[in-house]
Curated annotation (Swiss-Prot):
Protein name: tRNA pseudouridine synthase D
Keywords associated with the record: Isomerase, tRNA processing
Name of the gene encoding the protein in the UniProt record: truD
Species of origin: Campylobacter jejuni subsp. jejuni serotype O:2 (strain ATCC 700819 / NCTC 11168)
Domain TRUD residue range list: 160-330
Catalytic activity: uridine(13) in tRNA = pseudouridine(13) in tRNA
GO molecular function: RNA binding; tRNA pseudouridine(13) synthase activity
């Protein structure tokens, strides 16, 4: 697999099979709203202030710069649980040293509001959130397309979704991962944060390609015979039978890495029949590889073979990255929707665990790339 010679953006496979649905989506502050959900309650005491903010059409870093200039707090002294996109309206939490509290009473900005202030013992860190709730408004939706949207949402609610990394990881032209590969090959870059971001884009690209291969396997297992699966994947008759027996869409594989969902340690899938029950109950999920020296290793069999197809040409860089695992299969929570036929608006609300992308879910529903 020669990544740097590819001229087209890789498009992961969808898990649902319907045709594209016509709807208009604009990622603006009225039609795309994100609400961060903290991992824990704030204590009400300590040396840090927690600011609950609403920002519109600003990145998290742009919001921090505005607050820094107004307060005198250095950007590095702010804390946040997650970086949020520029487009849309975002409600999120930031932390800052309490000694700068006095500036808050006079703070005013047209795109940035401070809604609430809490006190806490520690600075917010990346990952200190449970997840995010989303509101999405689609426009120009005909009644026939509204019915298709409802069916797609019911299917996703039942089966879950492929937890791909979103376009935000890969840049305007979808090729950030190529720059990450160049850095791993020795290209120098002074900006440490940008260097880390580009390397993570490389890891994310490989993760998406492997997950897409697993989605393909799941489709094939549903649609093809045991004999055809044996020919395609060079597996035993028993392994083909195991695949065909699995009723859920996303097929688990013996020897792959699983994790307790939505938070928990990794472990190998040794007893497939036992783990299938826990997977269907949404207690565990399959974990894809973010390549690196410390990532939990896959065991054996088809899971390892498929992984090697994607990662074999990049193993020389493994020691240069820490690595980890990421859930490949996620679930919509608190899902609801409503259709206003008169306005031709279709509104969707749901909650996602941290690290999942609402735009990935929306692309799966609509079956088209949002920002081409």
């Amino acid at each position: 697999m020669n990544l740097e010679e590819e001229n087209t953006i890789f498009k992961p496979l969808y898990s649902l099979k319907h045709s594209p649905i016509n709807a208009y989506f604009s990622k603006n502050s009225d039609d795309f709203v994100v609400r961060e959900r903290p991992l824990y309650e704030f204590s009400g005491k300590g040396e840090h202030l927690i600011l609950h903010i609403n920002k519109k059409d600003l990145t998290t870093n742009e919001a921090l710069k505005i607050l820094s200039e107004a307060s005198g707090v250095k950007i590095r002294d702010f804390g946040y649980a997650g970086l949020k996109d520029k487009q849309g309206s975002t409600f999120q939490y930031l932390s800052m040293p309490k000694k700068f509290e006095s500036f808050l009473s006079n703070f005013s900005h047209p795109k940035l509001k401070i809604l609430e202030i809490f006190t806490h013992e520690n600075k917010l860190r990346i990952g200190h959130l449970k997840g995010n709730s989303f509101f999405i408004r689609l426009k120009k939706v005909l009644p026939s397309d509204a019915l298709k949207l409802e069916q797609a949402l019911m299917n996703l609610d039942k089966q879950g979704f492929a937890n791909y990394f979103g376009y935000q990881r890969f840049g305007k032209f979808g090729d950030n991962y190529k720059e990450g590969l160049e850095i791993l090959r020795g290209k120098k870059m002074k900006n440490v944060k940008m260097k880390e971001f580009l390397i993570s884009a490389f890891q994310s690209e490989l993760f998406n390609r492997y997950l897409s291969k697993r989605v393909e396997l799941s489709h094939f297992a549903n649609d093809f015979s045991e004999k055809e699966l044996i020919q395609i994947y060079k597996i035993s008759k028993e392994e083909a039978k195991e695949l065909k027996k699995q009723e859920q869409f996303f097929k688990l594989l013996k020897g792959e890495v699983l994790g307790h969902y939505p938070f928990g340690k990794c472990f190998l899938c040794e007893d497939l029949s036992a783990e299938l029950g826990r997977f269907k109950a949404r207690d565990i999920s399959a974990m894809g590889l973010l390549i690196g020296a410390k990532a939990y290793e896959t065991g054996e069999g088809l899971a390892l073979n498929l992984e090697n197809e994607i990662f074999k040409d990049t193993l020389e860089f493994k020691a240069k990255m820490q690595g980890s695992r990421r859930f490949m299969w996620g679930y919509l929570e608190e899902l609801k929707w409503r259709y206003d036929e008169e306005k031709a608006h279709f509104c969707i609300e749901f909650f996602l665990q941290k690290g999942s992308y609402a735009t990935v879910v929306l692309e799966e529903i609509l079956h088209k790339n949002l920002f081409e």
